Amino acid sequence: MSATSVDTQRTKGQDNKVQNGSLHQKDTVHDNDFEPYLTGQSNQSNSYPSMSDPYLSSYYPPSIGFPYSLNEAPWSTAGDPPIPYLTTYGQLSNGDHHFMHDAVFGQPGGLGNNIYQHRFNFFPENPAFSAWGTSGSQGQQTQSSAYGSSYTYPPSSLGGTVVDGQPGFHSDTLSKAPGMNSLEQGMVGLKIGDVSSSAVKTVGSVVSSVALTGVLSGNGGTNVNMPVSKPTSWAAIASKPAKPQPKMKTKSGPVMGGGLPPPPIKHNMDIGTWDNKGPVPKAPVPQQAPSPQAAPQPQQVAQPLPAQPPALAQPQYQSPQQPPQTRWVAPRNRNAAFGQSGGAGSDSNSPGNVQPNSAPSVESHPVLEKLKAAHSYNPKEFEWNLKSGRVFIIKSYSEDDIHRSIKYSIWCSTEHGNKRLDSAFRCMSSKGPVYLLFSVNGSGHFCGVAEMKSPVDYGTSAGVWSQDKWKGKFDVQWIFVKDVPNNQLRHIRLENNDNKPVTNSRDTQEVPLEKAKQVLKIISSYKHTTSIFDDFAHYEKRQEEEEVVRKERQSRNKQ
């Protein structure tokens, strides 16, 4: 009985031998008997993906069921280690979805447990596997940290070299590529400094290295220690004082204040705007004031003061750059005049020193002497409390025309302005005066008051103005010739001009009688320090130059 069963079993076992069969032979073999073999083989090689191409159809779930388990384990067990380019996707059952990103980001064994990276990175795909060693089970390395072995690469891609301080892979137990820790430490330890020795490139050539503490060598596990100069940190560099910059050469001449800017450039224009008042200074020596001031005030500047103080005063006044510059006057006079911001008669500090400047200027030019002798300018007593009369604002384009109006006792406005003034003069007749409050555009002050003495003669052209476009003329008599800053009159507002200040008026803007009384009172009582008389000689010279140019133009036109 027993012998027969043994022979029967031996005969059946010999007939059913298979190469990879089970250890215990049975009479019948079922499909379920192979599952332990497949499952065991799957567990051993679970981390070895056979995905050489990341774009295979494994992304899509299988549409039919399979009698065997689906996984990525290699079918061959010939003994060669698999080449895991991608991580495993885990056990795939029928109907489950398989996504590529599961292998690329964050899965156990994804990019971290595998020695070689997949083709998404730039490292080569065919490294020499002999350089990795054979210790440890392939694909079953433990991950030391979440980021410990990311971005690793085989040493063969470096030409068979290792990084300073990194032994061979056969002793690496942290599942990291050779030289990873040393490379990270080398990047952290980058310093600024010169390295006296040189680093050896993988091809054997010698190049000088700067700011490297660990370098690559040609030996598999040798270390190259580079003597580095004394380390210098960024903080030490930032703490060093900046190198002193060479000082720019200053112009020769009187010493000015520390950071005073140069005086503004004055452009020479024949029309005589506010930017071109006063003697034209020479370009090479803009700082020397005696030469420009010699024309309007030759004796005034030379006698009381030396030659250099005017040059000192000019930058001191121009450095604050007060809003619109007035006509060109002596800088000390202008500073004294517009430095006062109080009410009328508040120039307690300036009259004793500066106010007499207008008197000595009488000797500057004979024409001015005749005018002062024929007219009593700036009377001490003036009837400003008018019972009847009309007052108008006159805006001039240049102070040259103011000079000629005082010289010839005439004036001319625009065509519209002439009609308005002529109508007012004829309307008042002998009932009251018609006063004109003169101001130059952009000057920042009123320069005087004149009374209209005749109706407008539309058919006559004076031919003395800085521009030839004005037609008609009428006689005027100048009463006040003084510079009154706008801040003395800005509080007076005109109800017939949108309640704007009187200083913000157009040409031939009429001032209501009650407001006109206030303006006349302030102008008459204001103790001025400057006036156009200070530069009268300068405007005389400009007029002579214009006459020469006009005659030359006329002679060319005749030819």
From Swiss-Prot:
Q: Name one GO molecular function term.
A: N6-methyladenosine-containing RNA reader activity
Specify residue ranges for compositional bias: Basic and acidic residues.
24-33
* Subunit field text: Interacts with CNOT1; promoting recruitment of the CCR4-NOT complex. Interacts with ribosomes. Interacts with eIF3 (EIF3A or EIF3B). Interacts with YTHDF3.
The answer to whether UniProt assigns keyword Secreted to this entry is no
GO cellular component terms, alphabetically, are:
cytoplasm; cytoplasmic stress granule; P-body
Q: Which residues form the YTH domain?
A: 389-523
What does the record list as coiled-coil region(s)?
none
> What does the protein in this record do?
Specifically recognizes and binds N6-methyladenosine (m6A)-containing mRNAs, and regulates their stability. M6A is a modification present at internal sites of mRNAs and some non-coding RNAs and plays a role in mRNA stability and processing. Acts as a regulator of mRNA stability by promoting degradation of m6A-containing mRNAs via interaction with the CCR4-NOT complex. The YTHDF paralogs (YTHDF1, YTHDF2 and YTHDF3) shares m6A-containing mRNAs targets and act redundantly to mediate mRNA degradation and cellular differentiation.
Please provide an example of a Pfam family that matches this protein in its UniProt record. Answer: YTH
Amino acid composition bias (Low complexity), ranges on this chain: 296-320
Q: What is this protein called?
A: YTH domain-containing family protein 1
Q: What is the effect of changing Y397A?
A: Strongly reduced binding to N6-methyladenosine (m6A)-containing RNAs
Q: Which GO terms describe its biological process?
A: immune system process; learning; memory; mRNA destabilization; organelle assembly; positive regulation of translation; positive regulation of translational initiation; regulation of antigen processing and presentation
Q: What is the predominant subcellular site recorded for this chain?
A: cytoplasm
Q: Where is the composition biased (Polar residues)?
A: 346-361
Q: Which residues are recorded with the post-translational modification Phosphoserine?
A: S182
Q: PTM comment for this protein?
A: Ubiquitinated by the CUL7-FBXW8 E3 ligase complex leading to degradation. Deubiquitinated and stabilized by USP5 by removing 'Lys-11'-linked polyubiquitination.
Q: Residues bearing N-acetylserine?
A: S2
State where the protein is found.
Cytoplasm; Cytoplasm, P-body; Cytoplasm, Stress granule
InterPro entries found in the cross-reference section: YTH_domain, YTH_prot
Instruction: Name the residue ranges with Pro residues bias.
Output: 281-295
Residue ranges of the region described as Disordered: 1-50, 238-363
| Notes on the domains | The disordered regions have the ability to interact with each other and to 'phase separate' into liquid droplets within the cytosol following binding to mRNAs containing multiple m6A-modified residues. This leads to the partition of m6A-containing mRNAs into membraneless compartments, where mRNAs may be stored, degraded or used to transport mRNAs to dendritic arbors in neurons.
